[in-house]
Amino acid sequence: MKSPRGRQLVLDLPHRSALGRDDFLVSRSNAEAVALIDRWPSWPTTALALVGHAGSGKTHLAEVWRRMSEAKIIAAQALARSDIPPLLAEGALVIEDAAGTDLDERALFHLLNLAREQNAFILLTAQEPPATWRLKLPDLASRLKAIPVIRLGLPDDDLLRGVIVKLFADRQISVDEAVVSYILTRIPRALAAARALLAEIDRRALEEKAEVTRNFVARILRELDQGSLFSDDEI
């Protein structure tokens, strides 16, 4: 069925990202972080902070560790309404966006103490290191300043190129190398930017029944408001 303008109607269904360890691409910008995650359970402490700006890949890397350790996962803002001890029942826990202003500091401090007592593991994710968080509880601030910080830098060209190629492959879109190179030079250095653009390319290619060529991508980039397209946080 076609729309009045002759374009194919496209169901806006979610695309499932591949988030396994084999799907996580490694380059100089993230190799140190990946190596430390892979060292689990031989971590130097029972808690680590995984830090990186939006689009750096921290959500994907945290998911890699969650699967590896069979950890539970919780948003930091949900700690206030959670029963704390059961969160460490599996021996591992991911706490996402731990630097939020609505963080229950006493709950987090309790979790860190429990992890130490039970030899369980906690991975905190945030955009900034714990030393910069505006905490009110002195004991928590002191404890967090002592935990190792895993930093993810913005993706370098090698990583971003690999991610673009992988995203096309995930969506079963065949493109020339020239298309990948063209995209690489025209998007922000953030994995979220690549995901957002590839999702739009996929949608438009299906809608228009078009081959994904350099000219097709160029037209999409010209027509899009890049500010809105590339402002989303990482998946």
Segments and roles (model prediction):
Residues 1-39, 44, 206-235:
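A short, basic N-terminal segment
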Residues 84-126:
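Conserved nucleotide-sensing/catalytic segment adjacent to the nucleotide-binding pocket
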Residues 147-159:
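Conserved AAA+ ATPase "SRH/arginine-finger" region at the nucleotide-binding site
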Residues 45-61:
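Walker A/P-loop nucleotide-binding motif
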Residues 147, 161-174:
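Conserved AAA+ ATPase "sensor/coupling" helix adjacent to the nucleotide-binding pocket
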Residues 130-145:
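Short regulatory helix/loop adjacent to the ATP-binding pocket of P-loop NTPases
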Residues 66-77:
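Post-Walker A helix-loop "phosphate-sensing" segment adjacent to the P-loop in P-loop NTPases
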Residues 181-185, 192-206:
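C-terminal helical "lid" of AAA+/P-loop NTPase domains
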